[in-house]
Amino acid sequence: MKYDGYIQSSDYEDLYFDIIQPNIINLNLLFAGFKPVKNKHYLELGFGMGRSLLTHAVSNEGHFVGTDFNENQVAFAKNICEQAKISNLTLYADSFEQLLERFRKMRAKGEEVSFDFIVLHGIYCWVNEENRQIILSIIKEFLREGGVVYISYNCLPGRATNMDARHIFKLYSQNENTENFDKIFSFTEKFAQLEPENTINKNILDTINTHRHSHPIYRIHEFLCDSWYLPYFSDMAETMKKLGDLNYICECVLAYHFKKFTPKQENFLAQINDVIFKEQMKDFILNKRFRYDLYGKELLKLSDKQIDDYLFYTQFVLLDYPTSHTFKDCEENLKWAYIELISRLENEDFTPKSAKTLMMGIDINQRVFFSLLINLMTLNLVGICMPNTTRKIDEVKFYNHSLLKNQKLSEEYIFACALTGGGISLDSLERAFLNHYFNENQMNLEELFERIYQNENFHFNDANNQACKDRESVFTQLSLHYKKFLRRLPILMKLEMF
């Protein structure tokens, strides 16, 4: 079943995207030289199962709104919202057209309807032209001055190599009335093997091999929807510019602000003054397949001193410890700097530290320092830390405990954190251990280990990376995992998540 070209026969994956967290967006704005967005009136278009929106609403002050026209997905998100008593979240099961009409009626009645953040992750290229125009109307009419739009999408040139395969997948699916990708891949692969050295067929085979083990639901949404819009970045930038006073700010990927090109590439790019043209040429250099764009409406440009002031007084907090392999391939001086940063964040009982405090006495320049900090964030070892209210911290604790109670033993899950304003992942073992920690009277540790051992969804390898097959070797690995959990536990408690 499809709605305006979008697949509705299956619910989308239950995924979390920290890239659309307000504090992460604001840090990207800072690195791009713009003042962060102060208020958090936030709209997500096409929120899927709602994991990101739920997490961000419960973790932040402000008001959060979202719509998705898959009623099953909205019902799932609403159920969690009601159980967790999230007070600042409004969820609609509207199409984009219905949402636009709803907002216009609300405004006509004198209600305040405008947003500081409008985000849409991945859906723009999966809906038809009519819906893309409606999305643009929502942005044009309801984005506040000083607000930002986050929009991510499949793009050219990188996706060009998937176009032929996708076309065959779609035709086979329609003709055989199937969404079974074993059959779709089998047919397409047989065709490509007729002349495997042909460039087109090589691309088809590469597409199949790349997605052979992708999540089945993702494959259906990616390749079988009626609309598969593939713009170049410059096309998207031109589209957004036509909305009026909406300018490209940066790619909303923290590590991209520190992206290094070769000297030849840098020299070539240096001759291009136009921001959009230069960014497009970077996409050609990198063969970009997917973009995460930020556009701003009359944002305030900061001076270098103002940027430094904001950055150096931004606080960061430890989220987890690195493993023995995390910095294995780093240069020695960088390895030392990473370890020193982790040590400083660990000091004073894991109290959040400003960038200025963390950098003090470390003999590296500012750009390298922030690139190291961002790398630690990318590894989910460090998080940005913003002050929050007692009310929000209490809401987060209630939300997280409700997740602990309701999820299956073997599920990895995203928990909310009011200090970071976003989600923190706990793997299935950490979640099981945490549940035991709060309910120790219900089961002793050996009983928990036995329960995990009997669960077919858990698999363990020994120190030689061989599968553990007997009870004793599994219990040995569980003991090691439990020690690791006990080391992380004080961090989780300091984050006031539970």
Placement of each model-derived feature along the sequence:
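Conserved SAM-binding loop of SAM-dependent methyltransferases across substrates and taxa
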Residues: 49-61
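Conserved alpha-helix/loop element of class I SAM-dependent methyltransferases that forms part
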Residues: 10-40
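Rossmann-like AdoMet/SAM-dependent catalytic core
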Residues: 204-374, 379-446, 450, 455, ...
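Conserved SAM-binding strand-loop segment of SAM-dependent methyltransferases
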Residues: 85-98
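Conserved SAM-binding loop
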Residues: 77-78
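Conserved SAM-binding motif I beta-strand of class I
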Residues: 63-68
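A short glycine-rich, Lys/Arg-flanked "PGG" loop and its adjoining helix->strand segment in the class I
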Residues: 133-145
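Conserved beta-strand signature within the Rossmann-like core of class I S-adenosyl-L-methionine
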Residues: 146-154
